[in-house]
């Protein structure tokens, strides 16, 4: 099996795991459950991270997004409890893993055209570009993907301030 085939094999397993995790949530939940705003003060642009429940729907609607990023988060990471209205129902708790500084900087540096310098230490990230022929896997910690909780984000360039 070539390196590319190995990466695709791992990626597909991760996607299947994500789908199973997301199916634990109500299917009628609102699409966007949390938005992280990161302002790198680069060219006056903001970067926003949209966290989604329904992976299948998101993967079918990537035309407005530049990249799909999957963050593996170690199981011992403490989640942040956020109350958000989901699917028009009263607030319910959503547990979201925290971003680390390394994950933030690594994610931003993947946007080569923005000119961010590479981080000192790359975190473990499964990175998918919109073109599904370009799949990048960067496991640095030597930890099996199955031992992570998975968080998925679409990366979108916002207009204006």
Curated annotation (Swiss-Prot):
Highest rank taxon of the organism: Eukaryota
GO cellular component, one term: cytoplasm
Effect of disrupting the coding gene: Deletion decreases survival upon exposure to K1 killer toxin.
Name used for this protein in its record: Putative uncharacterized protein FYV1
Protein species of origin: Saccharomyces cerevisiae (strain ATCC 204508 / S288c) (Baker's yeast)
